[in-house]
């Protein structure tokens, strides 16, 4: 399938290794595409969980997906700064329905103060056994977790200081009907968010 264009809206679907739909984000605006990368923004979007529960996200988020990397990143714009949620996951595929990937349970959360925390190791161990993750997948995910920590420490890709500002501003340019900006009039908050 052809890559979406900037300004297009796509759905994002997260699956588990056994093929069940884990989570669906209804509207994500694409703000950048490259051969292997999609960057999008969702802002108060409808999210549907695997059990049918629905909720609306509280804050804007910049999402980063790569066709060759075994992780994706969500940068959440919060009043106290940017928090990152990095999912260890399969590279994405794209079809007419949605951008899709397999969520492999492990996550690394980066708090606005820079603290990093590995999440859901118990869920990973349980699902690895239950769904028979191969040694190859286990090895890929282990090496990817170190690669991801390097990206975080080196402020690479979605963890770069200006990443959030650049792509959130692009989102606002593509949505001229909105008379608001997360950064507008919030210079002190902006400095805090960007770590400057």
Swiss-Prot record:
EC numbers? 3.6.1.15, 3.6.1.6
Q: Which reaction does it catalyse?
A: a ribonucleoside 5'-triphosphate + H2O = a ribonucleoside 5'-diphosphate + phosphate + H(+); a ribonucleoside 5'-diphosphate + H2O = a ribonucleoside 5'-phosphate + phosphate + H(+)
Q: Which cofactor does it need?
A: Mg(2+)
Reported function = Has nucleoside phosphatase activity towards nucleoside triphosphates and nucleoside diphosphates.
Keywords recorded for this protein, A-Z? Hydrolase, Magnesium, Metal-binding
- Locate the active site: 23
Concerning its family, UniProt says: Belongs to the Ntdp family.
**Residues the entry annotates as binding Mg(2+) 2:** 105, 107, 120, 123
Q: List the Gene Ontology MF annotations in alphabetical order.
A: magnesium ion binding; nucleoside diphosphate phosphatase activity; ribonucleoside triphosphate phosphatase activity
Q: Please give the name of this protein.
A: Nucleoside triphosphate/diphosphate phosphatase
Q: Which InterPro entries match?
A: DUF402, FomD-like_sf, Ntdp-like, SA1684
**Could you say which residues bind Mg(2+) 1 here?**
87, 103, 107
Cite the PANTHER family for this sequence: PTHR39159, UPF0374 PROTEIN YGAC (PTHR39159:SF1)
Q: Does the keyword Hydrolase apply?
A: yes
Query: Could you name the domain of life of the organism this protein comes from?
Result: Bacteria
| Gene3D superfamilies reported for this sequence | FomD-like
* Signal peptide residues on this chain, from the entry's feature table: none
């Amino acid at each position: 399938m052809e890559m979406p264009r900037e300004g297009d809206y796509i759905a994002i679907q997260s699956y588990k290794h056994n093929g069940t739909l884990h989570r669906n984000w209804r509207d994500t605006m694409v703000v950048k595409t490259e051969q292997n990368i999609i960057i999008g923004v969702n802002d108060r979007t409808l999210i549907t969980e695997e059990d049918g529960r629905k909720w609306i996200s509280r804050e804007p988020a910049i999402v980063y997906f790569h066709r060759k990397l075994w992780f994706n990143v969500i940068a959440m714009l919060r009043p106290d700064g940017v928090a990152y949620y990095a999912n260890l996951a399969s590279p994405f595929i794209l079809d007419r329905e949605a951008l899709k990937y397999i969520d492999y349970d492990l996550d690394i959360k980066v708090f606005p103060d820079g603290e990093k925390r590995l999440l859901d190791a118990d869920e990973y161990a349980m699902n690895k056994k239950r769904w028979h993750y191969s040694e190859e997948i286990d090895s890929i995910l282990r090496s990817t977790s170190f690669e991801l920590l390097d990206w975080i420490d080196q402020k690479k890709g979605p963890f770069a200081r200006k990443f959030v500002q650049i792509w959130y501003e692009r989102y606002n340019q593509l949505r001229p009907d909105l008379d608001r900006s997360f950064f507008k009039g919030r210079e002190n908050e902006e400095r805090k968010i960007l770590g400057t």
